[in-house]
Amino acid sequence: MWHTAKITVDTEHYCTSTTQMAMAQMYGVIFDHEPKNKTMLCACPGTELHEMGARMVADLFENDGWDTIYLGAAVPKNALLESVRMNQPDLIALSVTMPQHLIDCKKVVDAIREEFPDVKIAVGGKAFESTDEIWKKWLIDLYTNDAREFLKRANEIVMDK
């Protein structure tokens, strides 16, 4: 909302940190589902700092029984690839809010596809909403701007190990 001058940057940061604290306090209360033996790695690639949506998606998957590896904001390509090597996720979810970070996201997608051609890749975030479905050209397995739909479709495309 700061980019439309509805609130200031400091107000946005305050609201974000308050929301993150509330989410963290709920963590032990809501995550009690049967494990699904599926792993999802979630990150904001490059210099993307807006991680709230990615955090919420990771928590939604965790609540559904997935193991989640949440790397957070501004994850460099090489660090993300190393995490994929170590954790061997079934699904990699990349979140981009600001359009200028789409280039970094594309580089990460290309690197993942080159080294891990069979892993499922999903993208999401506000930046993709005005791109005329650019994700379709990126060999992406899943895109939606709805978290519940994302979880439903992820469960369909990722089979049990």
Question: Model-flagged regions — what are they?
Answer:
Residues 46, 50-52, 71-78, 103-104:
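A general structural motif
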Residues 60-63, 75-133:
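Cofactor-cradling patches in redox/metallo enzymes
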Residues 127-161:
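Peripheral docking tails and interdomain loops at the edges
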Residues 1-31:
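Long amphipathic alpha-helical segments
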Residues 38-40:
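Conserved hydrophobic helix-helix packing surfaces used for dimerization/oligomerization
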Residues 43-45, 95:
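Short hydrophobic segments within beta-strands
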Residues 67, 90, 141:
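Residue-level detector of anion-binding/catalytic polar loops
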Residues 55-69:
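Short helix-loop-beta junction
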